[in-house]
């Protein structure tokens, strides 16, 4: 049995290996956005529980009733049961601060010409992209990044740019 984090690390390891990057490091700075009180619930469920049309980008998890925090066992459609923990979560600015730290960690490699592959969930990668571009992290909501797709961030004439997106 593996914990959620161990399973994610195995998935990331396999993804990195398939992309030709066998040597990897875990960057906690690009861990999945902590949805807190919304974790394990659909947007519809959260909206019903909160009494308003909740949106993670606009409202964040801390806008939700603290009564939504706690621990429970969720049963997946496959029948598998997984533990869910809900704390207060983090707002988009806190997630953005983490991604700025990740960028700072990989910049020395980029500055000497190395390629860097970051494997993570779409929301945190969208937020990271906003920080790469130097724009407000809420801009990330406008960047569609589908499951199992990639993007390439690079520099062009001294500016951080998006070279390819949602490929």
PLM region descriptions:
Residues 1-67, 159:
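Phosphate-coordination/substrate-recognition cap region in phosphate-metabolizing enzymes
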Residues 96, 100-108, 129:
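Generic structural signal for well-ordered alpha-helical scaffold segments
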Residues 122-126, 156:
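GST superfamily/GST-like fold recognition
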């Amino acid at each position: 049995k593996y914990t959620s984090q161990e399973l994610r690390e195995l998935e990331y390891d396999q993804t990195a290996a398939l992309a030709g990057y066998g040597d990897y490091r875990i960057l906690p700075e690009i861990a999945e956005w902590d949805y807190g009180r919304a974790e394990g619930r659909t947007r519809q469920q959260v909206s019903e529980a909160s009494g308003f049309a909740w949106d993670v980008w606009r409202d964040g998890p801390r806008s939700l009733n603290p009564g939504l925090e706690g621990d429970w066992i969720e049963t997946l459609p496959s029948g598998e049961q997984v533990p869910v923990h809900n704390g207060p979560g983090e707002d988009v600015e806190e997630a953005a601060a983490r991604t700025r730290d990740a960028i700072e960690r990989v910049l020395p490699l980029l500055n000497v010409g190395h390629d860097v592959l970051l494997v993570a969930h779409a929301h945190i990668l969208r937020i990271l992209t906003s920080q790469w571009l130097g724009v407000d992290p809420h801009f990330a909501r406008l960047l569609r990044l589908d499951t199992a797709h990639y993007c390439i961030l690079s520099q062009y004439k001294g500016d951080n740019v998006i070279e390819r997106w949602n490929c």
